[in-house]
Swiss-Prot record:
Gene: gltX2
Organism this protein belongs to: Brucella anthropi (strain ATCC 49188 / DSM 6882 / CCUG 24695 / JCM 21032 / LMG 3331 / NBRC 15819 / NCTC 12168 / Alc 37) (Ochrobactrum anthropi)
GO molecular function: ATP binding; glutamate-tRNA ligase activity; tRNA binding
Primary localisation category: cytoplasm
Binding site for ATP: K253
This protein's record includes keyword Isomerase: no
Name the UniProt record assigns to this protein: Glutamate--tRNA ligase 2
Length: 457
């Protein structure tokens, strides 16, 4: 058996880091088990689904390093779902209902007032052909509900009916089908809700494992019943915890908040996003994995907590810095060249500045300092100006190397009596225009004698 998983986003908005958690969990599970990863767009909601969102999802996944083995669109598979609908109708497991939303709400309130569970009472099953014809004469069209197998002989005498599965994350799980309403699978306009196409596709595409958020736990009991009604064995399920904002709110892809695209545009490294999406809310230490291979080694569904995890953007900043500070030049070289940072100075430059970067693009700022004209620098005090004039007069002759800074500052210290911050800060400001930054021993060599002299006060 080939392990086959799927990530099934609805292209009604941009994916956020919470969706990324699901996508990466499936991708890494497939990688660890020599399996296949299917990207399936759940685009049966024709009104809200957009191709632009589907394309954006593909771009986001590619940026993260997720490469689907197969791509499917549910909107192109309606004929397959139609056959499943007919099979369920023939088996007497799909029945027509004509209630309006208002009528259903009134019934729900009435059941609550009678201290009954607010589940659908299967009134549609009681309709005669004449009653159905009368509704349709009024212009009503039926929606279709799946008859849950929560009774022995009489569908109006429901019995506790437990569905069990061994969840990859949560362990043994049980749901009672008697506590649920028969789910609507087909809308009045003939379009399909999520549940049926999802099951049909999982059967048709050979999905062996379903890994998704724990907001689907209850759905799983219903879907297992539909799998069995269609004569198929249900896949293995795993339900990971959900990510929330710091304030505990759910993440919404339609708001664009924390979307993968916005994180990419903000300059975060893909492995920073992937590391946090996978490791947060687990027993693993949240630290940056340099590549997917190392993240896969740390990925373990059994380590995921059963409570929700709060996404803190500050953690993403920390991981991003850690990745940049350890990134080898071989990995950074092409990206640096694309920003105009190349030549023999590029590698020593990268080694010098990477430890001070929050974002990769910040390297451009430091390149302009070592290889360009310095922007305006703070005017030194008169005392510092005199000090700098004396210091620049003591610059060692070329050629310079990494000992030049030490030789120079020791000479300046001996001549001026300054030491510590009083010595180093005026020199840093004069050379870089910045109060903080990479080691000046590294920068001085990169700036070079000629450019250094232009920064003399």
């Amino acid at each position: 058996m080939t392990v086959t998983v799927r990530f099934a986003p609805s292209p009604t908005g941009y994916i956020h880091i919470g969706n990324t958690r699901t996508a990466l969990s499936n991708w890494l599970f497939a990688q660890k088990n020599g399996g296949k990863f299917i990207l399936r767009y759940d685009d049966t909601d024709v009104e809200r689904s957009r191709e632009e969102y589907a394309q954006a999802i593909a771009v986001d996944l590619d940026w993260l390093g997720v490469k689907p083995d197969r791509v499917e669109y549910q909107s192109k598979r309606f004929d397959v779902y139609g056959k499943a609908v007919e099979k369920l109708k023939q088996a007497g497991l799909l029945y027509a209902c004509y209630e309006t939303a208002d009528e259903l709400e009134r019934r729900r309130k009435l059941r609550l007032a009678r201290r009954l569970p607010p589940v659908y009472g299967r009134e549609g099953l009681k309709l005669t052909d004449d009653e159905k014809a009368a509704f349709e004469a009024e212009g009503r069209k039926p929606h279709w509900r799946f008859l849950l197998p929560n009774f022995e002989a009489d569908p109006f005498d429901t019995q506790r009916t437990e569905v069990h599965w061994d969840d990859l994350v949560r362990g043994p799980q049980t749901v009672d089908l008697a506590s649920m309403s028969d789910p609507v699978l087909v809308r009045e306009d003939g379009t399909y809700l999520y549940t049926l196409p999802s099951v049909v596709d999982d059967i048709d595409l050979g999905v062996t494992h379903i890994i998704r958020g724990d907001d689907h736990v209850t759905n799983t009991g219903v879907q297992i019943a539909i799998f069995e009604a269609l004569g198929a064995k249900a896949p293995v399920f795993g339900h990971h915890n959900l990510l929330t904002t710091i304030s505990g709110e759910g993440l919404s892809k339609r708001t664009g908040a924390l979307s993968v695209g916005s994180l990419r545009d903000a300059g975060f490294e893909p492995m920073a996003v992937a590391s946090l999406a996978i490791l947060i809310g687990t027993s693993e230490n949240v630290s940056a994995a340099p590549n997917m291979e190392s993240l896969a080694e740390r990925f373990d569904l059994a380590s995921i907590s059963k409570s929700s995890a709060k996404f803190d953007p500050a953690e993403l900043d920390t991981l991003n810095r850690a990745l940049l500070h350890e990134m080898p030049f071989s990995e950074a070289q092409l990206r640096l060249a694309a920003m105009g940072i190349c030549g023999e100075k590029a590698e020593p430059f990268w080694r010098a500045v990477r430890g001070n970067l929050d974002r990769f693009k910040d390297a451009v700022h430091w390149w302009s300092i070592v290889d360009g004209d310095l922007p305006e620098t703070p005017d030194p005090s008169e005392e510092d100006r005199v000090f700098l004039e004396e210091a620049f007069a003591l610059l060692p002759p070329a050629p310079w190397d990494h000992q030049t800074w030490k030789v120079w500052t020791e000479a300046v210290k001996a001549a001026t009596g300054r030491k510590g911050k009083n010595l180093f800060m005026p020199l840093r400001l004069a050379l870089t225009g910045q109060a903080h930054g990479p080691e000046l021993a590294d920068l001085l060599v990169l700036i070079g004698p000629e450019r250094t002299l232009t920064r003399r006060p």
